């Protein structure tokens, strides 16, 4: 118990944030403002954008219509929380933002520099390496292979799916959907604290 508590201590400024998005279907109760169609996932609903630390707990959360691209959703999320990056001193290491291949670092950099010109002195984008077929064969693996560090955010997505109220989007507004997402993680973190 003590070891786990010690390991969980985090520094004030993180050095790694993992990003992912998840398309979720709407129910008939969902409002018009939260309806969009994601052609890639063939989902009519919303998209949850999540930024987590190395323990899988959220740094930032944001919900958009499902037809919003991953890049645009991430830009909106980071813009909403730009004060975190403004307050970060220049003398601490850059934050690595690890994204998958659905994101385009050049597009993200150009958009964020318009909002906060000094941001790229404080963060850097990195796409997680996807193992090639030759690498899989060399390791004797086939099909789905866990990508280093990416499993953390995939686990966070599965934590969300364990909340019954998040299986589908029932909320009338995107703000309510984001709040429901935050409540899910607050509940999870409180349970962890209670067991220490």
Write out the residue ranges for each language-model feature:
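Helix-centric, low-specificity signal for extended rod-like, repetitive segments
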Residues: 18, 41, 141-143, 148, ...
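Polybasic low-complexity intrinsically disordered regions
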Residues: 1-115, 128-130, 185
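Catalytic-loop motifs flanking and including active-site residues across diverse enzymes
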Residues: 70-73, 152, 179-182
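Tryptophan-centered motif/residue detector
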Residues: 22, 58-59, 151, 159, ...
